[in-house]
Amino acid sequence: MNTALAQQIANEGGVEAWMIAQQHKSLLRFLTCGSVDDGKSTLIGRLLHDTRQIYEDQLSSLHNDSKRHGTQGEKLDLALLVDGLQAEREQGITIDVAYRYFSTEKRKFIIADTPGHEQYTRNMATGASTCELAILLIDARKGVLDQTRRHSFISTLLGIKHLVVAINKMDLVDYSEETFTRIREDYLTFAGLLPGNLDIRFVPLSALEGDNVASQSESMPWYSGPTLLEVLETVEIQRVVDAQPMRFPVQYVNRPNLDFRGYAGTLASGRVEVGQRVKVLPSGVESNVARIVTFDGDREEAFAGEAITLVLTDEIDISRGDLLLAADETLPAVQSASVDVVWMAEQPLSPGQSYDIKIAGKKTRARVDGIRYQVDINNLTQREVENLPLNGIGLVDLTFDEPLVLDRYQQNPVTGGLILIDRLSNVTVGAGMVHEPVSQATAAPSQFSVFELELNALVRRHFPHWGARDLLGDK
């Protein structure tokens, strides 16, 4: 066992007391990003090492791996703690997103180590989608690069408001204050173009030597600010979803026997309580919450982020992909929306193409009506393009095969975030953030009888593999 962990458990009064204390610590999800070879994996390894999160057998294995695959000469290659794929170790790079957990006396952390190569931008966007803070690594010798700008923009696009700019490898520039100041000013000039009100902090450090990571550096007396770990432990994260209206996307209809019918999912935002009047969209049918069922038993109320099963007082038609919200709230379905898209496929995104999309628990199809612009990541200007290339970021107009209930992504990432899927290969080719729902869904002229419309709805619900189109959607 990790001796530091064993000592901590003993200080807490035993395993049970230690586990209770862990449950009450706040959790921060953050990612490391930046250009290739800026030291992201090494920084995470240093954080784990200096906070004593490495077991003795892991440390012994790390010494052996450093001799075989290490890139730091005689020194311990801490990046190998995170780079687990054989291809990563052979090339000395990060390819996949690696997740690690650690905790201190003040907070719990989940880290996403994302790749720096441009061709793996899709993996970086995946890692950023669940994070609340981003550590942007900058090599002190190279300064602000294209990938630094791209990752900064993607992070803010995905709703991350806290950016920590870690200027790494200060040991290779003789811990120069002038270098730190120059890079800081360069980044602030670029950051002025980023959308939203951002909390940006700068820390000069050396992940390899441990300077300003978990302890103050004696080599940089000119820096009097907090260490990186102190920033992570003290930053205040305000979760937007807690203050937002209730959103409960239905993931699964739970009917284990004839006496129970519940609707399972994760509460995306707001809160729900027993007795509350709720509305089901898109049908608009209302009911009351009879029970809130969890793994630990029934609850009187639940909050954003909790996995629950809702039991309603009425037997009504609810399926996967439907959305429950407060009965007094109005949220119209829309047939189209403008969406910020990060494109992840070799084949460019072009107008006229159709894709499957998934948003919350809903799966349907969408057509690309047009590309308004692509963002130039160097200066964040908008330029007209005919298609969106691999790793391109732009605003795209989508029309859906059926009316959807959406939020803007900045208001609710769950009901405003979607993925685009190639219908032939079933590969995810794009990540989308709803920028603006642009038109309210309206019924087509009454060219079909009531029976035909009801039959169409029945076939689409129970026989989706037939591929029947929505008559009301005029498709």
Curated annotation (Swiss-Prot):
Q: What InterPro entries does its record include? A: CysN_GTP-bd (IPR041757), CysN_II (IPR044138), CysN_NoDQ_III (IPR044139), G_TR_CS (IPR031157), GTP-eEF1A_C (IPR054696), P-loop_NTPase (IPR027417), Small_GTP-bd (IPR005225), SO4_adenylTrfase_lsu (IPR011779)
> In this record, what's one Pfam family?
GTP_EFTU
Residue ranges of domain tr-type G in the record: 25-239
Q: Where is this region: G5?
A: 206-208
CDD domains for this protein: CysN_ATPS, CysN_NodQ_II, CysN_NoDQ_III
Q: Which reaction does it catalyse?
A: sulfate + ATP + H(+) = adenosine 5'-phosphosulfate + diphosphate
Q: Which NCBIfam families match?
A: CysN, PRK05124.1, small_GTP
Task: Please report which protein family the annotation says this sequence is part of.
Answer: Belongs to the TRAFAC class translation factor GTPase superfamily. Classic translation factor GTPase family. CysN/NodQ subfamily.
Assembly description: Heterodimer composed of CysD, the smaller subunit, and CysN.
Q: Which PANTHER family match?
A: TRANSLATION FACTOR
Instruction: Report what the protein is called.
Output: Sulfate adenylyltransferase subunit 1
Its source organism is Escherichia coli O127:H6 (strain E2348/69 / EPEC)
